[in-house]
C-alpha cells in the first residue's frame, strides 16, 4: 500500500508533542486517507500515572500537532475516538485549501515548543497577551485558570506542589520509575532517543556510573521542594487546566490546549505533582475557581532562555506496519 508522502511529515509534527518523562507513549498507523494514533501501553508510567490519564493527555498533544500540520498541508481532518483509546483521523485533501491565520500561528509553534525546566527571569506576562491565549483554549469541557503571585490560589498551589513532592519522593516505585527514564549522558540519550536527558535537566555529560548515584541521591523531598520553590518564585503565573469529566475524551481535549502556551515567547514547565497524588488532586478539585471541574495539569509560566530540546524517536519507529482501520 502507498501513502501520501506528507503523511510522514504529519507524524513528524505529532511526535514533537510532550509526554510524561518523554516516554513518547504513542504509535501510528497509516491508511490511504487516514492516520490512527494509538496508546503504546508498553511505555505507560505505571507508578506516576496508573490510570493512564497523563498518557492520554500526551496523545491529545500529538493529535493537536497532527491536525495543525494536516491543515497546513491542505487536508481537512476529522477525528474519532474509539472505545479502545485509538484516535482515527480521516484526512481529505482539499482542492482549494484556505489556511487559517490562527492555525498557521499555532503550527509555527510546533518546532519551538519545549518543556523549559529552567528558573525563569521573573518578568510578568502581560495580561493583554495571556488572556487571549487562555480564552481561545476554553471550551465546554476544558477550562484554563491562571493565577498571578498576588492571588491566594498561587500560594495554595505552591503548597500542593510541596505536598506532592513529599509524597512522591517517599515512594520507592515513583523514584525507581523516574530513574529508569533518565538518560545520563549523550551516548545514553542517542541510544534511546527518549526519556529525560541530562541536557534538559541541566546536568553535565558524565558517564552513567558517575551521574546515576549522584542523581539518585538528589531524589529527595527536601532538595526537590527547594528547587521547585525557587522556580515557582521566578514564574509569572501558575496555570491549572481542568475538565468537566475524567475520561479519555476529556484528557485528549486537555492535551490539545497546551501548544498555545508557547506563543509570545512564553515558557512553561509542568508542576503536576499535585495532580498525580490522589489526595492532593482531590483537594485541588475543591478550589472554587474550578467550579467542580477535575484538575488535570498544573504548569508554571514565565520567560526564560531556551533549553536544549528533548530527543524524539525516528518517525519510522513509531509507525505500525499494519494498515490503519
Predicted stretch roles:
Residues 1-325:
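Acidic, surface-exposed loops and disordered segments
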Amino acid at each position: 500500500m502507498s501513502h501520501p508522502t506528507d503523511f510522514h511529515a504529519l507524524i513528524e509534527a505529532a511526535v514533537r508533542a510532550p509526554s510524561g518523562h518523554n516516554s513518547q507513549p504513542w504509535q501510528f498507523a497509516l491508511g490511504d486517507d487516514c492516520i490512527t494514533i494509538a496508546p503504546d501501553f508498553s511505555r505507560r508510567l505505571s507508578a506516576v500515572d496508573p490510570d493512564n490519564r497523563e498518557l492520554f493527555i500526551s496523545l491529545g498533544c500529538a493529535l493537536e500537532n497532527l491536525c495543525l500540520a494536516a491543515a497546513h498541508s491542505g487536508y481537512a481532518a476529522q477525528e474519532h475516538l474509539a472505545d479502545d483509546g485509538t484516535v482515527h483521523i480521516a484526512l481529505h485533501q482539499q482542492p482549494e485549501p484556505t489556511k487559517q491565520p490562527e492555525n498557521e500561528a499555532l503550527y509555527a509553534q510546533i518546532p519551538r515548543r519545549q518543556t523549559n525546566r529552567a528558573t525563569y527571569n521573573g518578568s510578568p506576562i502581560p495580561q493583554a497577551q495571556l488572556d487571549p491565549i487562555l480564552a481561545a483554549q476554553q471550551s465546554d469541557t476544558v477550562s484554563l485558570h491562571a493565577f498571578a503571585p498576588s492571588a491566594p490560589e498561587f500560594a495554595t498551589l505552591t503548597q500542593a506542589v510541596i505536598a506532592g513532592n513529599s509524597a512522591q519522593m517517599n515512594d520507592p516505585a515513583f523514584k525507581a520509575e523516574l530513574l529508569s527514564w533518565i538518560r545520563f549522558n549523550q551516548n545514553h540519550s542517542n541510544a534511546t532517543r527518549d526519556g529525560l536527558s541530562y541536557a534538559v535537566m541541566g546536568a553535565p555529560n558524565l558517564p552513567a556510573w558517575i551521574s546515576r548515584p549522584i542523581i539518585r541521591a538528589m531524589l529527595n523531598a527536601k532538595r526537590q521542594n527547594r528547587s521547585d520553590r525557587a522556580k515557582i518564585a521566578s514564574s509569572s503565573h501558575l496555570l491549572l487546566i481542568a475538565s468537566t469529566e475524567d475520561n479519555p475524551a476529556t484528557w485528549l481535549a486537555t492535551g490539545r490546549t497546551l501548544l498555545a502556551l508557547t506563543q509570545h515567547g512564553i515558557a512553561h514547565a509542568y508542576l503536576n505533582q499535585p495532580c498525580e497524588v490522589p489526595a492532593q488532586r482531590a483537594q485541588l478539585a475543591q478550589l472554587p475557581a474550578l467550579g467542580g471541574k477535575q484538575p488535570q495539569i498544573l504548569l508554571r509560566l514565565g520567560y526564560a532562555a531556551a533549553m536544549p530540546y528533548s530527543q524524539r524517536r525516528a518517525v519510522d519507529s513509531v509507525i505500525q506496519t499494519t494498515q490503519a482501520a
